[in-house]
């Protein structure tokens, strides 16, 4: 974290194992605390404070406010320290404060109390300044105060918000600090609010990339993870989703309607209407439309994977092309090679996967089946429609198909009365 806390504790309840595993992934040093009975925010803080040092300040955040910026929290912490507060709460003014606790201020403008909506009168519900669930407390004071909490409220829970009025009544200095951007403080309680927050985060991320020199044609339909790295002068077309450890080099064009997950894209590459994951796309390579690039694939510079091509765990050499309607699995393809339309790399025997090796400057004829394990030497050809089951030496052509036989008059004898038979008769065909 940019805030560099001395210790990080996360209180978990529902779906404990899933949450704990995720916390370990993103913050291995964080300590998780289990709240078996959900007795309110005050109870959660009681559990988190156990065995925590009594010195310094503690920052408390809600787990459902993911839009908070570290800069906002830094300013909040600095204001708390500068004013030597015992307790501070971050607030926001919302267009619709429904569902949030209200901030009650005195005539002097200072905070008097925080009242949860279920406990608020109609007069208090008219207040649009709300509690964001972000606090800073002096640890020693907080430890004492949370032990005094009671359940005298509509939900029968221990409210952390009651600590503010308690500290105030005991002469401690408390403050409500207003956030300038209320969207940072939005909470998530349902799928609608989740979608709203996701859209805000999307816009933030896209704005950052655009200001750094990335062209995003339609930011509202372009979704980019925070983990993605994009160099300047990249163009992203509508309907694109970039996730994971994806890195895109300068001059590349991505989309429209393209998904990249953990993909390294080198300079000047072009990927259109395709799905690519855990792969590497070389400089000036072309992918799509409608290509499916699966994990373990490496496309060298100036290579091409075209329309309706699926590639899995394969390396395609510099300048090589798989232009149309093919499946390439577990293959090594050299440079300057062309794979004809409808070629299938038959890599699976029902039990194990096998590798196919294709050399440099090879020409694979359309509708060829390469039954692995098999290899095709440099400069070799395969005849269209062949089923290749044996290695082809360099410079040879592999022909593996039955000889064509024309049976004259078959349509007239076997399909009499059909349109085909009528056309054949007009063309001079006979039954003999």
Indicate where each model-derived feature is located.
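Glycine-rich hexapeptide-repeat left-handed beta-helix
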Residues: 270-432
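Structural beta-sheet core signal
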Residues: 9-10, 59-60, 87-90, 176
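Acidic, glycine-rich loop-and-beta core segments that form the ion-binding/anion-interacting portion
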Residues: 222-297, 301
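Conserved core of the sugar-phosphate nucleotidyltransferase
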Residues: 17, 21, 28, 68-154, ...
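Residues that recognize and position ribonucleotide moieties
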Residues: 66, 128, 135, 157, ...
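Conserved N-terminal catalytic core of the sugar/cofactor nucleotidyltransferase
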Residues: 1-78, 82, 419
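Residue-level signal for inorganic ion chemistry
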Residues: 8-10, 48, 64, 103, ...
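Conserved alpha/beta core of the MobA/IspD/sugar-nucleotide pyrophosphorylase nucleotidyltransferase superfamily
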Residues: 128-231
């Amino acid at each position: 974290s940019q805030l560099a806390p001395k210790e990080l504790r996360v209180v978990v309840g529902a779906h404990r194992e899933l949450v704990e595993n995720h916390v370990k992934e993103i913050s291995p040093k964080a300590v998780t605390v289990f709240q078996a009975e959900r007795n309110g925010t005050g109870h959660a803080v009681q559990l988190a404070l156990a065995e925590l040092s009594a010195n310094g300040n503690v920052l408390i955040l809600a787990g459902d406010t993911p839009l908070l910026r570290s800069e906002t929290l830094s300013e909040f912490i600095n204001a708390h320290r500068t004013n030597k507060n015992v307790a501070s709460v971050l607030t926001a003014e919302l267009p619709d404060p429904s569902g949030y606790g209200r901030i009650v201020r005195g005539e002097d403008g200072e905070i008097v109390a925080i009242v949860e909506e279920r406990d608020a009168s109609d007069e208090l519900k008219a207040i649009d300044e709300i509690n964001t669930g972000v606090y800073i407390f002096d640890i020693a004071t907080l430890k004492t105060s949370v032990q005094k909490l009671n359940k005298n409220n509509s939900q029968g829970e221990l409210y952390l918000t009651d600590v503010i009025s308690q500290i105030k009544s005991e002469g401690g200095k408390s403050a409500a600090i207003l956030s300038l951007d209320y969207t940072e403080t939005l909470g998530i309680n349902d799928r609608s609010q989740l979608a709203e927050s996701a859209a805000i985060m999307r816009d933030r991320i896209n704005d950052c990339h655009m200001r750094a020199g990335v062209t995003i044609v339609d930011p509202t339909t372009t979704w980019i993870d925070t983990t993605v790295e994009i160099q300047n002068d990249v163009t992203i077309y509508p309907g694109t989703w970039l996730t994971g450890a994806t890195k895109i080099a300068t001059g590349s064009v991505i989309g429209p309607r393209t998904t990249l997950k953990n993909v390294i894209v080198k300079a000047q590459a072009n990927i259109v209407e395709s799905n690519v994951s855990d792969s590497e796309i070389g400089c000036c390579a072309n992918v799509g439309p409608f290509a499916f690039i699966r994990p373990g694939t490496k496309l060298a510079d100036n290579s091409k994977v075209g329309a309706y091509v699926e590639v899995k765990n394969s390396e395609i050499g510099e300048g090589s092309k798989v232009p149309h309607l093919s499946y390439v699995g577990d293959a090594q393809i050299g440079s300057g090679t062309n794979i004809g339309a409808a070629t299938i790399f038959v890599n699976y025997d029902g039990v194990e996967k096998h590798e196919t090796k294709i050399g440099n400057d090879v020409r694979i004829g359309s509708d060829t089946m390469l039954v692995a394990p098999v290899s095709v030497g440099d400069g070799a050809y395969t005849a269209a429609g062949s089923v290749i089951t044996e290695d082809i030496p360099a410079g040879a052509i592999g022909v593996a198909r039955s000889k064509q036989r024309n049976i004259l008059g078959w349509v007239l004898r076997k399909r009499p009365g059909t349109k085909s038979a009528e056309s054949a008769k007009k063309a001079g065909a006979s039954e003999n």
